């Protein structure tokens, strides 16, 4: 009987440019669910304007073959792999395409709607007949810069996560702000919010979608 061969996980650092037409598709979420990767977002710049490209610096880790397949998937979508580093060795790069220093900033809601209010909002969301889609704004504190917070929403709770807008400067200069569209069962959504609360990350539920975009 042969022993199962252990495959050492690999790590890839990639800067990607996502075309505007894919802003409403959970591209990064699929890297986790489809290829079983851990994805840490190291920097992000994405606006709600579908005409603008989205920029992400990603740290991808997982099975080497699945990593290769995931990069092929991105290229198949027309995602530009601006910079790619494997084991800290630059494989392909275009230094003329530096990460944008965007003046765009998300507007956090009033501090009264911090993490201690999400359960009340969640109950309101359920009372209006919502069961599988939830929008929220998430602040990823700079102390969590090295942790794949959004990736775990997919791998641990089985959610589909679409990032609709984001701003996270490189090198943990500031907190990161993300507008997220979460899809999943009610229990999964509730558990994921509890997880974010335990981390101490500020979250605001966006109930406007309940009324205006069912």
Predicted regions and their residues:
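Long, contiguous binding/interaction regions
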Residues: 2-177, 181-214
């Amino acid at each position: 009987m042969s022993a199962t061969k252990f495959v050492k996980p690999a790590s890839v650092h990639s800067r990607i440019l996502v075309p505007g037409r894919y802003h409403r598709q959970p591209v990064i979420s699929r890297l986790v669910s489809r290829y079983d990767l851990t994805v840490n977002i190291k920097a992000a710049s994405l606006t709600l304007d579908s005409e603008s490209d989205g920029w992400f610096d990603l740290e991808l880790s997982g099975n080497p073959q699945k990593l290769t397949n995931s990069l092929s998937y991105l290229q198949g979508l027309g995602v530009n792999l601006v910079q790619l580093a494997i084991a800290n060795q630059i494989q392909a790069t275009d230094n003329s395409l530096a990460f944008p220093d965007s003046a765009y900033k998300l507007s956090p809601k009033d501090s009264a709607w911090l993490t201690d209010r999400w359960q009340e909002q969640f109950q309101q969301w359920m009372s209006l007949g919502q069961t599988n889609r939830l929008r929220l704004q998430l602040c990823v504190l700079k102390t969590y810069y090295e942790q794949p917070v959004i990736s775990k929403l997919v791998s641990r709770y089985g959610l589909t996560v679409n990032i609709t807008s984001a701003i996270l400067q490189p090198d943990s200069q500031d907190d990161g702000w993300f507008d997220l569209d979460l899809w999943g069962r009610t229990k999964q959504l509730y558990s994921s919010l509890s997880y974010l609360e335990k981390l101490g990350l500020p979250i605001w539920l966006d109930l406007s979608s309940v009324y205006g975009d069912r």
